[in-house]
Regions:
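Residue-level signal for transmembrane alpha-helical positions in Major Facilitator Superfamily
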Residues: 34, 38, 50, 87, ...
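Helix-terminus/linker motif at the lipid-water interface of multi-pass membrane proteins
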Residues: 49-68, 137-144, 200-207, 267-296, ...
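Small-residue-rich hydrophobic transmembrane alpha-helices
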Residues: 55, 67-127, 164-183, 277, ...
């Protein structure tokens, strides 16, 4: 059926139930950017909140070793899933571009190809995780007192990868048409399931890290079921039919062109963080646990930046498809402003009240000391990540995914590895190890911003 525009909303014709889709091509922008980004931010923050509750349950009702085992896996998990999560971003951009071009005939092929890729990538990660869990933790130098627990958690965690990928790709499809609410609702439900299962498995059944892993798998299954249901009951051309799952070569090519550079960037970025985690491991279990505690709050702040970065990807994607330079410029400015202010305020709030927030996770003085250092050195400057996330998001929306990928790999990955191999090897100091984060953010942000302005001038000249 024909889709038409009414009062800034995409709707099907009056013979069917109205489907609310945000019109990113016309009208005011600030309110729409906020309406799009806030559910995204809430989605990620709620997910992290639920994960933090699970981590706190492990720390309070299991042991410091169990807490360290769970915390030591965050960079490994990120390393192994970011490539495929980046590919899901490719489906978002491709669909957004088609919407901007008003080409609804090719959208169904992208939708069904994306879900097929989600299934294949999830199964691949499930199998890979079982084989590499222990070797990669050994390579990272995980302490002997936690390595067996960390391996167990990681192997259980990856059992849920097919469901995680189905949610990730499905949510990306919905966001491409302006729907950020239903992915949020799905995560709220799965987050509640995660907390309940954590309490059941860890507190009642005393399963420790195994219980935490099983709770995460249960939550992933819950979110995947919901997102697939939403897509199967969506209106054309987004509606999913399991019988129509396919691998369309043209769609795969376009998705991978955008998604692979973004995924590789995230993968190399995560690899650098794995190396930094190895440096953290060298300070012992207290440093690992303290860093894990701070990371919970660091994620909260970063997810605000990431929400606005995802927002500008979709908004820029549609408006670049429509060749609207004025709106593309405004999208960049508003996205950057919202990202810096929101992340900066939340980060400073956490830093000011750090004693209370750290105390929610641990009473161990040694763990507390390391957590405070990371709060002060890293979280204070978290808003700097906006510089490369927002500009890079706009470039991806323009279909130029390789440029921000290369620059971010150099600025935030190569530099960190050089820092580890030189400064941190000369001076075994936790503060110097943490300092690489704000330093790399400044360098990366400067390079990606320059690339954004140069690319935009060329595209619209």
């Amino acid at each position: 059926m024909k889709i038409y525009r009414k009062d800034g909303i995409y709707m099907k014709n009056s013979s069917s139930k109205a489907s609310m889709k945000m019109d990113m091509l016309h009208g005011s922008l600030l309110d729409k950017i906020l309406l799009f980004a806030m559910p995204l931010a809430a989605c990620s923050i709620l997910q992290q909140l639920f994960n933090s509750v699970g981590t706190a349950v492990v720390g309070r009702f299991a042991s410091s070793e169990a807490l360290a085992a769970v915390g030591s896996n965050s960079s490994v998990i990120s390393l192994m899933v970011t490539l495929f999560s980046g590919i899901s971003l490719g489906s978002n951009v491709v669909i957004a571009n088609y919407i901007g071009q008003q080409d609804t005939k090719r959208i169904p092929r992208v939708v069904h190809t994306a879900i097929s890729l989600a299934l294949l990538s999830g199964i691949f990660l499930l199998i890979l995780g079982q084989f590499v869990a222990h070797p990669i933790l050994v390579l990272m130098g995980a302490p002997k007192d936690i390595i067996n627990l960390a391996t167990l958690y990681l192997r259980i965690y990856f059992l849920g990868m097919p469901f995680f990928m189905l949610y990730d790709f499905g949510a990306s499809i919905l966001r491409s048409i302006g729907d950020t609410r239903r992915p949020m609702y799905a995560l709220i439900v799965s987050g509640v399931v995660n907390v309940i299962l954590n309490l059941l498995f860890v507190v009642v059944f005393h399963l420790g890290v195994a219980g935490a892993g099983l709770a995460t798998v249960g939550a992933n299954i819950t979110s995947a079921i919901q997102i697939i249901y939403f897509l199967m009951h969506e209106e054309l051309p987004i509606r999913l039919s399991l019988k129509s799952l396919m691998i369309d070569r043209d769609s795969v090519s376009k998705i991978l062109k955008i998604g692979v550079p973004a995924g590789l960037q995230g993968m190399v970025f995560s690899l650098a963080n794995v190396c930094i985690q190895s440096g953290i491991n060298s300070f012992g279990s207290a440093a690992i646990a303290g860093s894990a505690v701070e990371l919970n709050y660091e994620y909260f702040s970063y997810y605000l930046v990431n929400a606005f970065a995802q927002t500008v990807v979709t908004f820029a994607g549609q408006n670049y498809g429509a060749k609207d330079e004025v709106r593309c410029k405004k999208i960049f400015r508003l996205g950057m402003l919202c990202s810096v202010i929101s992340c900066g305020v939340l980060s400073l709030f956490f830093v000011i009240f750090r004693t209370f927030f750290i105390g929610l996770f641990t009473n161990d003085p040694a763990v507390y000391r390391y957590a405070v250092l990371r709060f002060l050195i890293v979280l204070t400057f978290e808003a700097l990540t906006s510089s490369y996330e927002i500009s890079g998001g706009c470039l991806r929306g323009f279909g130029r995914s390789m440029t921000p990928a290369i620059l971010t790999v150099f600025g935030s990955c190569v530099l960190r590895l050089i820092w580890l191999a030189t400064v941190c090897s000369w001076f075994h100091d936790y503060k110097l190890l943490m300092a690489i984060y704000p330093i790399s953010w400044v360098l990366t942000g400067t390079m990606v911003l320059i690339a954004y302005f140069r690319t935009r001038r060329k595209l619209f000249c």
